[in-house]
Amino acid sequence: MNNLLFVDASPHGSRSLGARIAREAIAQWQAAHPHARVVSRSLGQPGLPSISADYAHALVARQPDSDPALACSEQLIAEVEHSDGVLISTPMHNFTVPAALKLWIDFVLRIGRTFAATPEGKVGLLADRPVLVLVRSGGICRGAAARQPDFLTPYLKQVLAVIGFSTVDFIYLEGVAPDDAAIDAVRGQLAQSALLARRATETA
């Protein structure tokens, strides 16, 4: 079984340019694995519930996974656990991840469930798998032409490493109105990512 989890963090949903590129990545995955299952998790409207006092209490009290307050977290973690690869499409908001993606992270990073706290630091409890992050930024945040900082990339790398994911690629689509050449360049990078290159190799 080759399951792909697609996490879409754009408030524009399927209408966003990032989502359009993501659909092309998904199509490449499905072409390599016609019977693969794709699970889509949209973080736009209506979005995930806010972190509640009951949820916070369940974490502190180390309640069992079956506790109703942990239901949303359990569902999101299960989607990650059952995947063989993860595709995240996200805008960059104020130099970092949007609030909707931060909320998903807060539900997925859970002590005793996706990571363990040890004297040496946090250790991931999930097996590594390829992750591809498509980043849509209105400003230029990389290279000599950068005019704004990028806190999204190092933050997401650390977040994913905490739960055990180290095979992570980032592809960026920058600028308010990227031209066709920029979009084609992004398309060319898709096949070079661990997520899609590995799948192409497996079917060769």
UniProtKB/Swiss-Prot annotation:
Co-factor remark: Binds 1 FMN per subunit.
Indicate whether Flavoprotein appears among the record's keywords.
yes
Q: What top-level branch of life does the organism fall under?
A: Bacteria
GO MF term (any one): electron transfer activity
Q: Where does FMN bind?
A: S10
A Pfam family it matches: Flavodoxin_2
Q: Fill in the subunit field for this protein.
A: Homodimer.
Q: Quote the function comment for this protein.
A: Quinone reductase that provides resistance to thiol-specific stress caused by electrophilic quinones. Also exhibits azoreductase activity. Catalyzes the reductive cleavage of the azo bond in aromatic azo compounds to the corresponding amines.
Q: What is this protein called?
A: FMN-dependent NADH:quinone oxidoreductase 5
**Gene label:** azoR5
